[in-house]
Amino acid sequence: MGTYCFGIDVGGTTVKCGLFRTDGTLVEKWEIPTRKENNGDQILPDVAAAVNAKIEEKGISKDDVEGVGIGVPGPVNSKGEVDRAVNLYWGYKNVAGEMEELTGLHAKAGNDANVAALGEAWKGAAAGSSDVIMVTLVSAVELLLMARS
């Protein structure tokens, strides 16, 4: 198992990036602009460049990186594919597959509200709770209910 992982939140204005230890400890966070021109074609290459630059800056071997988790606005299937993300101007996009190609790292993608709720349940305000309701309000309202019964 790698020592590090990246968490990425793709928003309509900025992409929030985090380098973490696999125990959930935040090492560093930063943002890059979300470039939506040309149907958002540069968003994932920009994210990959930011991840690769941080690996180089910190002197981390890619063998020490478990992977990249990326949250995007819109429905994401179990393969990490998006059929449409309206506020990013995306039609179909294999988010996980493209990130793997661009970074050489294992990647998983999910809906931004879902992965935010998972993070809160693991290390955030909902840690230790058996049931969680998360509401996000950014460019859209999203609601997630997690019941661990």
Kindly label every feature range from the protein language model.
Residues 51, 55-58, 103:
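Structural signal for hydrophobic packing residues in well-ordered secondary-structure cores
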Residues 55-62, 125:
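Alpha-helix termini
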